[in-house]
UniProtKB/Swiss-Prot annotation:
Protein name: Thymidylate kinase
Residue sites binding ATP per the record: G7, C8, E9, G10, T11, G12, K13, T14
Function: Phosphorylation of dTMP to form dTDP in both de novo and salvage pathways of dTTP synthesis.
HAMAP family: Thymidylate_kinase
CDD domains, per the entry: TMPK (cd01672)
Lineage of origin: Bacteria, Bacillati, Mycoplasmatota, Mollicutes, Acholeplasmatales
Length: 207
């Protein structure tokens, strides 16, 4: 099973993916990973993409680096784990690329999907999209991880609003009902319960 967490900055993706991993690991064989990142080579790409100096990078170069990270991530970690019947929990995946590179950066969706074509056969079984007003999300980032501000955190509020619109459009167009929207302004415990209930309801996973 493949589970992904999506959302703008400061929505709690990392917190909730880690919590779910800790819960599921008590009963199932699980892998917790992230994008960009997830391996030694991937961390090199992650450092390039998230460094504060990345604000000036060409948008096509940025998209290609994300695609390279995903190709390595899939071949070295995600696919092998799925083949071993492990549950893969990923903090960001392909939906992030659409929201950030297409909606916020303004790149052609055809271009972005073409360079990520290899990933289209490995779509998550369920995606938890944590929705939050971007202004609140950025405030959370500054409050809870002030020493870990990255290049995307430094973007203007208008950029983050475009990212959110991208995610909401993906939710609306999701004919497979793969993406499950959660109000990320709710208390953490409430969100945990919503995630657990959804997994029990759809996949009969007991936590």
């Amino acid at each position: 099973m493949f589970i992904s967490f999506e959302g703008c900055e400061g929505t709690g993706k990392t917190t909730h993916s880690r919590y779910l991993f800790e819960k599921l690991s008590k009963k199932y064989s699980c892998v917790l990973t992230k994008e960009p990142g997830g391996g030694l080579f991937n961390e090199v790409i992650r450092n390039i993409l998230l460094h504060s100096s990345n604000k000036q990078i060409d948008f096509h170069t940025e998209a290609l680096l994300f695609a390279a990270d995903r190709a390595e991530h899939l071949s070295k970690l995600i696919i092998p784990a799925l083949q071993q019947n492990k549950i893969v929990i990923c903090d960001r995946y392909l939906d992030s690329t659409i929201a950030y590179q297409v909606y916020a950066r303004g790149l052609s969706q055809d271009f972005v999907l073409n360079i990520n074509n290899f990933a289209l056969n490995y779509i998550p079984n369920i995606t938890f999209y944590l929705d939050l007003d971007p202004k609140i999300g950025i405030q959370r980032v500054k409050q809870f991880r002030p020493k870990e501000i990255n290049s995307f955190d430094l973007q203007k509020l208008s950029f983050h609003k475009k990212v959110r619109k991208g995610y909401l459009d993906l939710c609306q167009k999701d004919q497979q009902k793969r993406i499950f929207l959660i109000d990320a302004s709710k208390p953490l415990e409430n969100i945990y319960n919503i995630i657990e209930q959804k997994l029990k309801e759809v996949f009969q996973i007991e936590l």
